[in-house]
Amino acid sequence: MTSGPKVLVVGAGSPNADMVAEALRTAGVDAEWTDQVKRPSIRRIMRVDVVYGIYLQTCSRYILVAKLLGKITIVHFVGSDAYWVKREPSSWRRRYWRFVLNCCNLIFYVSPHLEQLVGRKGIVLPFPILTATFRNAKRSSAIPDRDVLYYCPSGQTNEKIYRLSWITDFARQHPDEKITIIGNSSHPANYRLELPNVEIIPYVERSQMPTLYKRHKTLIRMTTEDGLARMVHEAILCGLKVIYNGSEVTEVPPEREPAEFASAFKRALADIL
């Protein structure tokens, strides 16, 4: 049974608004979601008390319309959106993003350093992942047939942010290592690399990620714009060794558990109601 203020989760891509809304619903929050971010639905906004946007640049229109309609507004910074605000070259766009943030009753960050980038006080809250699903995958009898899984979606900017040059150098230096490069559904990996030990997978559906992890021994994530990549903790739960920006990661934040995430969200929301 759901109760309390009704929440509309707004977001496109990853982290997925549907997963966040489901975590909230399971914890008793009356939550729905939309990934149709370009044209805010006034009707949907009127039906709810809170508009909760994921990734500033995709949810800003919803935030502004919701504020005009007197709703409580929340933005959750994912990582690259905070870097985007920091490096925005246009003065009028910088003013626009500041205006959107000033319209927010509450701001979440997946990592403390993003708060420093944005310059607006908020609450650190990692997104939930399907922890039970990945723990179950760890218990499977599947034997890895590849060595390294590496995330690097295609695109000139993505190649720099996710350091395509790093993994190609690694592949050349470790010819016996079987390496997989993967992107995501919004930005697939479509590289043509003349490296016999590298396989390119454009992307896989979210439901197939546990199987993909189990095919590999190690996940390596290298990025110039670090947030709190959920792949890092999904892979740990699946039993992989995880290297993130040169350091091994072994711990999973408690808020990755859907129930813990929802409890933290409810506490933060209660403080501003």
Stretch-by-stretch model annotation:
Residues 53-59, 77:
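Short His-centered aromatic/hydrophobic patch
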Residues 80, 89-106:
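Membrane-proximal helix-turn-helix segments that form the acceptor-binding/catalytic region
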Residues 50, 66-85:
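Active-site proximal beta-strand in glycosyltransferases
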Residues 101-124, 186-189:
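A short, active-site helix/loop in glycosyltransferases that binds the activated sugar's phosphate group
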Residues 224:
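Aromatic "clamp/platform" in nucleotide-sugar-dependent glycosyltransferases that forms part
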Residues 140-162, 168-174, 179-182:
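Conserved donor-binding/catalytic core segment of Leloir-type glycosyltransferases
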Residues 129-145, 190-192:
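Acidic anion/phosphate-binding donor-loop and adjacent secondary structure
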Residues 188-207:
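Nucleotide-activated donor-binding/catalytic signature segment of Leloir-type glycosyltransferases, i.e.
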